[in-house]
């Protein structure tokens, strides 16, 4: 279930941020509330209808694709798979750029965490109000910019189709390696799925 939806549209230098609080209709776990600061009570009192928020989020994503924009989403298989599960019919019809995947593919053996906070530190991006939805969306976009412009300029030479294929192949390879590792440790690997930008 969605608690906050934040979409930051960056188009030719113009920035438009839209964040919406949703009432998920279920209890928000205390641990999650401590991270993002939104309690069940706050969501119920101030949040909009959950299904409306999801529908408007999907419509905004599709509008961005229609306008020729690229969707930057940190850990795309998680968020986009959630949208598909919530709507039943969400599909990817435009370009996606996943800063987490790019980082894992380009710097595979770097030790340490790869959450958004640590990635901002690694790429020299300022992150204000971590775990606040709009701040996280801005930060993901800035990390993507740094990756393409400063660290991996070869990505800028790819067209949309090539970039999508590159990410899908890299994700498949990374997941296959992860699956083999789990199996070598006698661990269940059934949830290690290869699909990108959506699982399955």
Could you describe each region identified by the protein language model?
Residues 1-3, 26-27:
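Short, flexible loop/turn motifs enriched in small residues
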Residues 15-36, 40:
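Short, surface-exposed acidic-centric catalytic microdomains
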Residues 1, 10-16, 38-200:
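DEDD superfamily 3′-5′ metal-dependent exonuclease/proofreading module
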Residues 6-8:
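Conserved hydrophobic/aromatic positions in well-ordered beta-strands
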């Amino acid at each position: 279930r969605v608690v906050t939806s934040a979409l930051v549209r960056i188009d030719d230098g113009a920035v438009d941020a839209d964040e919406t609080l949703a009432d998920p209709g279920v209890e928000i776990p205390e641990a999650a509330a401590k991270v993002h600061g939104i309690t069940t009570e706050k969501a119920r009192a101030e949040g909009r209808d959950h299904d409306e928020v999801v529908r408007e989020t999907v419509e905004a994503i599709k509008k961005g694709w229609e306008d020729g924009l690229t969707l930057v989403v940190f850990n795309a298989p998680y968020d986009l798979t959630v949208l598909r599960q919530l709507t039943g019919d969400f599909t990817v019809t435009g370009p996606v750029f996943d800063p987490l995947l790019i980082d894992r593919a380009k710097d595979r053996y770097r030790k340490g965490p790869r959450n958004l906070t640590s990635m901002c530190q690694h790429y020299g991006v300022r992150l204000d109000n971590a775990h606040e939805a709009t701040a996280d969306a801005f930060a993901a976009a800035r990390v993507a910019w740094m990756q393409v412009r400063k660290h991996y300029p070869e990505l800028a030479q790819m067209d949309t189709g090539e970039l999508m294929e590159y990410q899908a192949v890299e994700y498949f390879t990374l997941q296959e390696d992860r699956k083999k590792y789990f199996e070598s440790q006698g661990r269940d690997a059934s949830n290690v799925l290869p699909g990108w930008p959506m699982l399955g």
